């Protein structure tokens, strides 16, 4: 088995072109890259966490966590939504995505984040600590999810004490006025 040595760092503005390249190559189109660029500039997404994975200096993966709140609540606990997670095709299956998730979760814990949500693959994210069916636990998604995909809306508590508050989750929406949706 080949051991690959990846490095991970919190991004800044100088990483913008590398983030765009990773997102575009991973998804095969620029829509996700455009969304990420907008979210990184959106005040309603803050505090955000953006991490880049590199292999021998080359950007190969990216993950973004943006602020989430309870709809209608001015003073929500610190929560985030993971979206998107991107790894360029030739580095998929090497553990880059999982390491980005774990590294991000550790940074979010240090920031005081209580919970992370994700809409993602129902068998992949539970391997990284996410619990399916967050809507059934009292945390409906910010957007409609068909019943057959409800297990894909997941959450992970980052504190020893689970949240006692429940409510409809709002996420940043850079296509709107910069307000949370």
From Swiss-Prot:
At the top level, the lineage of the source is: Bacteria
Residue span, N-acetyltransferase domain: 1-159
Q: Which residues form a coiled coil?
A: none
Q: Which GO terms describe its molecular function?
A: acyltransferase activity, transferring groups other than amino-acyl groups
According to the UniProt record, which cysteines are disulfide-bonded? none
Q: Would I find Lipid metabolism among this entry's keywords?
A: no
- Give the record's keywords alphabetically: Acyltransferase, Transferase
Q: Give the EC number(s) listed in the UniProt record.
A: 2.3.1.-
Is this entry keyworded Ligase? Answer: no
Q: Which InterPro entries match?
A: Acyl_CoA_acyltransferase, GNAT_dom
What's the family?
Belongs to the acetyltransferase family.
Q: What is this protein called?
A: Uncharacterized N-acetyltransferase YjhQ
Species assigned in the record: Escherichia coli (strain K12)
């Amino acid at each position: 088995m080949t051991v690959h040595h990846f490095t991970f760092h919190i991004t800044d503005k100088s990483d913008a072109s590398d983030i765009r390249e990773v997102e575009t190559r991973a998804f095969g189109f620029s829509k996700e890259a455009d969304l990420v660029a907008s979210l990184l500039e959106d005040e309603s997404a803050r505090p955000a966490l953006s991490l880049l994975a590199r292999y021998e200096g080359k950007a190969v993966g990216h993950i973004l966590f943006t602020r989430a709140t309870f709809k209608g609540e001015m003073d929500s606990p610190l929560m985030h939504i993971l979206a998107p997670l991107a790894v360029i095709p030739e580095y998929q299956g090497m553990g880059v995505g999982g390491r980005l998730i774990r590294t991000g979760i550790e940074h979010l814990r240090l920031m005081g984040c209580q919970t992370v949500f994700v809409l993602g693959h129902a068998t992949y994210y539970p391997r990284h600590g996410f619990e399916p069916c967050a809507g059934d636990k009292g945390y409906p998604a910010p957007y409609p999810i068909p019943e057959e995909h409800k297990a894909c809306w997941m959450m992970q508590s980052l504190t020893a004490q689970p949240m006692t508050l429940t409510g409809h989750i709002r996420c940043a929406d850079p296509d709107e006025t910069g307000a949370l949706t």
